[in-house]
C-alpha cells in the first residue's frame, strides 16, 4: 500500500496520508474506549486463594505471572536491607539475564558479605537440562561481572547461589539436592525449590498474603490491565477470583 502511495504526486500523497492518519486515530480511540478498567487490589482472602493456585501448577500466562510471584517471594526471602538493591524486579520475561548481567530473573548482591543470590522462575516442571543451559549462560555472565566482583574480593571468597523456583522438581536427578558447581572460577550453589516449598519456608501462604503493599507493587500492579497484554491480565483475574464471585 505505502509503496503504491509513494508513486502518487505530492498533493495526492499528502491527502491520502491525512486520511490514513485520521483512520488510525479513530481505531486507537475505539480500542482505548473498550479497554477494561484496572482491577482494584484484591482482599486478603483473594490473595490467599491466588497464591494457592500459583503454588499448585503453571499459571498458563507465558511465564509472566509465575515470574511476578517469584519476584514477590524472592524479596521476602532476602534481608530487608537488600530488598532495595535487587536487580531485575519487574523485568520483562523476555529480558535475558545476559543482557542485564544478572544471575537470575532477580538478583541480590551483598557486597559486605560477598554473596549473591539469584532467583530463576520456571513455570511447570523443572528438568536438569534447563539448569544446565542456564549454567552455560551463567558462565558468560560471571565472566562479565568478574572485574566488578574482583574489586570486592577474590572469586574464592564469593558465596553465589541460584535458586530455581518451579512448580514441579520431581524429575530432577543431577540437581535433585543442593549442588555446588564450578562456573567461571566461582563456586555456585544450585538449589531447586517448588513455589509451594518456598512459600512454606517463608511462613505459609496466609502469612504471605498479609504483605499487601509488596503484593500490590510486585504482583498486582505488574499484571493488571494496561501493564501487560490483556490475555495475561484476564488470566490473573481468573486466578484471583477463582471459586468466589465476591473478591474485592
Predicted regions, residues:
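Catalytic core segments in nucleotide and nucleic-acid processing enzymes
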Residues: 68-248
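Interdomain/boundary linker segments immediately adjacent to catalytic/signaling cores
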Residues: 1-70, 242-248
Amino acid at each position: 500500500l505505502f509503496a503504491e502511495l509513494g508513486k502518487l504526486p505530492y498533493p495526492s500523497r499528502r491527502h491520502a496520508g491525512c486520511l490514513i492518519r485520521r483512520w488510525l486515530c479513530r481505531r486507537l480511540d475505539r480500542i482505548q474506549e473498550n479497554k477494561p478498567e484496572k482491577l482494584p487490589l484484591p482482599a486478603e482472602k483473594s490473595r490467599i486463594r491466588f497464591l494457592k493456585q500459583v503454588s499448585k501448577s503453571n499459571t498458563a500466562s507465558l511465564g509472566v505471572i509465575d515470574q511476578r510471584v517469584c519476584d514477590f517471594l524472592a524479596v521476602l526471602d532476602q534481608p530487608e536491607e537488600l530488598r532495595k538493591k535487587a536487580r531485575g524486579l519487574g523485568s520483562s520475561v523476555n529480558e535475558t539475564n545476559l543482557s542485564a548481567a544478572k544471575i537470575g530473573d532477580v538478583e541480590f548482591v551483598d557486597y559486605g558479605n560477598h554473596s549473591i543470590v539469584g532467583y530463576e522462575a520456571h513455570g511447570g516442571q523443572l528438568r536438569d537440562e534447563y539448569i544446565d543451559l542456564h549454567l552455560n549462560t551463567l558462565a558468560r555472565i560471571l565472566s562479565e561481572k568478574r572485574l566488578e566482583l574482583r574489586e570486592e574480593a577474590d572469586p574464592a571468597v564469593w558465596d553465589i547461589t541460584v535458586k530455581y523456583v518451579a512448580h514441579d522438581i520431581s524429575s530432577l536427578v543431577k540437581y535433585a539436592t543442593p549442588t555446588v558447581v564450578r562456573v567461571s572460577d566461582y563456586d555456585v550453589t544450585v538449589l531447586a525449590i517448588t513455589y509451594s516449598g518456598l512459600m512454606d519456608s517463608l511462613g505459609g501462604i496466609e502469612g504471605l498474603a498479609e504483605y499487601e503493599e509488596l503484593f500490590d507493587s510486585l504482583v498486582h500492579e505488574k499484571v493488571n490491565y494496561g501493564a501487560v497484554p490483556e490475555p495475561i491480565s484476564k488470566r490473573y483475574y481468573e486466578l484471583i477470583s477463582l471459586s468466589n464471585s465476591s473478591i474485592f
